[in-house]
């Protein structure tokens, strides 16, 4: 029987690649619901191809346009928060792919867990902001959170060995600015920062990769996903992006997961876990690679990583504020309003001004997120050209 899935964020990079994986295995998946923020044309094309029972656009005006484009009585069209929650809880769905950027889908993910769904999680901001809340809910309900990020999928696979974990190592390519002096980074254009050397990703995560903020967010995410102490998680720069993560056990044994830089691999593993299916990808040729490089990150050149590690270690509402402030700062950079180096200035200022809540509930997390967005916008305006 085909596995029914819902895709939250179907028009984004991960959502599109998820549907590529689904299309590569005809008859083995059934797309029950698709959710997008505002891309009505692409969502309409996806709806026509995969024929879900439900299609949702968060933008209510565009949802009306979508209804006219689809015009199929067998497909329900909904909008806004109501539609998002309906898609997350749709009856018969086994797995919800959470691939929307930011924490807008947090309530929907919690509702999906309550409705008995497993989650294939590609949204790191949700676990950064509310990791304890989400993981506690999943454990209480005996539901599975399966990571989609390549690094966390790699850790997930390396942890199948059993035994006490001494250390987890997350790798980073170093991004397009890996060898650029800090003084030159202020002149980097959005086009330069979006030119990632190994991965094809959405714009927000690509900029986070350029600043190494992404790696700091991944450390926080790993802490919650795998119930680790913060100091058990390390970061190494690995330009080839072949080794995605490593796990060192207490006996000194070190397990690594290697593979090509192709997001379809971790996406498919999340969709098919605990099974492993065939996938048409170019095999990794280690002999052709010849060598693999590893180095420690330079926290002075990449202060966003240091800010993320500090916020993660402090806990409480600091990670939620970090994530929200970064999202706003990245939007300003992509719009050409601030420099790349100003991203860390915005995030640092907002973190410094934050009055944390040590053990936040859902309302506390959402309030911290909203405050951080407002404050980051004000700080960014002050730094804008």
UniProtKB/Swiss-Prot annotation:
InterPro entries attached to this UniProt entry: DXP_reductoisomerase, DXP_reductoisomerase_C, DXP_reductoisomerase_N, DXPR_C, DXPR_C_sf, NAD(P)-bd_dom_sf
Residues that hold NADPH according to the record: 11-14, 37-39, 123, 125, 202
Stated EC number for the protein is 1.1.1.267
Disulfide-bonded cysteines: none
- Cofactor dependence: Mg(2+); Mn(2+)
Pfam families in the record, alphabetically?
DXP_redisom_C, DXP_reductoisom, DXPR_C
What pathway or pathways are given for this protein in its record? Isoprenoid biosynthesis; isopentenyl diphosphate biosynthesis via DXP pathway; isopentenyl diphosphate from 1-deoxy-D-xylulose 5-phosphate: step 1/6
Q: Name one GO biological process term.
A: isopentenyl diphosphate biosynthetic process, methylerythritol 4-phosphate pathway involved in terpenoid biosynthetic process
Reaction equations catalysed: 2-C-methyl-D-erythritol 4-phosphate + NADP(+) = 1-deoxy-D-xylulose 5-phosphate + NADPH + H(+)
Q: What does this protein do?
A: Catalyzes the NADPH-dependent rearrangement and reduction of 1-deoxy-D-xylulose-5-phosphate (DXP) to 2-C-methyl-D-erythritol 4-phosphate (MEP).
Indicate the family of this protein. Belongs to the DXR family.
Q: What's the name of the protein?
A: 1-deoxy-D-xylulose 5-phosphate reductoisomerase
> What species does this protein belong to?
Moorella thermoacetica (strain ATCC 39073 / JCM 9320)
């Amino acid at each position: 029987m085909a596995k029914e899935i819902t895709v939250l964020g179907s028009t984004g990079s991960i959502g599109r690649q998820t549907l590529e994986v689904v299309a590569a295995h005809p008859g083995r998946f059934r797309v029950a619901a698709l959710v997008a923020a505002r891309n009505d044309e692409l969502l309409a094309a996806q709806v026509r191809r995969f024929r879900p029972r439900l299609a949702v656009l968060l933008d209510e005006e565009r949802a009306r346009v979508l209804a006219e484009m689809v015009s199929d009585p067998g497909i329900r069209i909904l909008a806004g928060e109501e539609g998002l929650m309906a898609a997350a809880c749709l009856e018969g769905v086994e797995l919800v792919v959470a691939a929307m950027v930011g924490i807008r889908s947090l309530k929907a993910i919690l509702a999906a867990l309550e409705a008995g769904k497993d989650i294939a999680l590609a949204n790191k901001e949700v676990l950064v902001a509310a990791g304890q809340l989400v993981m506690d809910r999943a454990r209480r309900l005996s539901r599975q959170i399966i990571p989609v990020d390549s690094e966390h999928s790699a850790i997930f696979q390396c942890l199948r060995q059993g035994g006490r974990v001494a250390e987890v190592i997350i790798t980073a390519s170093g991004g397009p600015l890996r060898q650029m002096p800090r003084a030159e980074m202020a002149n980097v254009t959005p086009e330069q920062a979006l030119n990632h050397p190994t991965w094809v990703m959405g714009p927000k995560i690509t900029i986070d990769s350029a600043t190494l903020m992404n790696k700091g967010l991944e450390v926080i995410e790993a802490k919650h996903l795998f119930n680790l102490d913060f100091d058990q998680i390390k970061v190494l720069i690995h330009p080839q992006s072949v080794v995605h993560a490593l796990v060192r056990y207490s006996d000194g044994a070190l397990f690594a997961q290697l593979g090509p830089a192709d997001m379809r691999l971790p996406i498919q593993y999340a969709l098919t876990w605990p099974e492993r299916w065939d996938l048409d990808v170019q095999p990794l040729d280690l002999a052709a690679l010849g060598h693999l490089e590893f180095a420690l990150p330079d926290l002075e050149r990449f202060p966003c990583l240091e800010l993320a590690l500090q916020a993660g270690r402090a806990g409480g509402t600091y990670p939620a504020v970090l994530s929200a402030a970064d999202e706003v700062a990245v939007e300003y950079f992509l719009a050409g309003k601030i420099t790349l180096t100003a991203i860390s200035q915005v995030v640092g200022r907002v973190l410094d001004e934050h009055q944390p809540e040590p053990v936040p509930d859902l309302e506390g997390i959402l309030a911290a997120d909203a405050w951080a967005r407002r404050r980051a916008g004000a700080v960014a305006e002050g730094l804008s050209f």
